[in-house]
């Protein structure tokens, strides 16, 4: 994916501010974890494939400086984080994961005005419209 300079600047700024740079994460490469369920891994692949088709840069398994590892990071997209829910529910995400994200994204999530996350249910057939 050829990036415009504005997109590259957005990515650089996001990664400088939030990503743990001691871990190298290539752009537009799908990294999967054996610890995830098959449905969860397939969900991540489907989302990444749709993003790639649309020319939207993404990163998977990015370790943030706060210690959190979102499923997919999309610094130039509508929202910065895409979470694929496999065995967990929205309530489980809120109880177990949300507090690990940087404060400004938690506040945006809680305000209901601006979105920080897109959630994809791995148990349902993937529909790329949920990403846009």
Where are the regions that the model predicts?
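Polar/charged alpha-helical tracts
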Residues: 9, 13-16, 53, 91, ...
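Interdomain/boundary linker segments immediately adjacent to catalytic/signaling cores
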Residues: 1-49
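Catalytic cores of nucleic-acid endonucleases
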Residues: 79, 84-132
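Generic detector of leucine side chains in alpha-helical contexts
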Residues: 3, 11, 15, 32, ...
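Short, flexible coil/linker elements and helix-boundary hinge sites characteristic
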Residues: 16-28, 55, 76, 97-100, ...
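Active-site metal-binding core of divalent-cation-utilizing nuclease and nuclease-like domains
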Residues: 24-36, 45-90
